[in-house]
Amino acid sequence: TFSDQPKIKFHLNDYTSKTAIANAISDIKWKGGNTFLDRALAMVRRQGLNPRYGSRPDVPQITVIITDGVSTDPRKTRRELKKLHAQNYILYAI
């Protein structure tokens, strides 16, 4: 989740079933505040898609971001997006 500061709620290797992952996602609560999308993307790049946390190098690295669509700092967000794209990450924004 993210607003002012991003927070990883769980890692890819924390759960072993689709049901457990769906339940973990359902338990995430909406958090009000700013939309520092750049900070969330930087966290994904540094920590989220890491083999130590369950990411596998032989599969596409996909991230889905659910946001209100208005980044607090569009310039920094574009910079983070370029870094992720340079590492061949696939991003979907909702």
Please give the residue ranges for each predicted region.
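Short amphipathic alpha-helical segments and helix-helix/interface helices
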Residues: 78-82
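Conserved acidic
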Residues: 68
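Anion (oxyanion) recognition and catalysis
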Residues: 85
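Von Willebrand factor
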Residues: 5-61, 71-76, 91-94
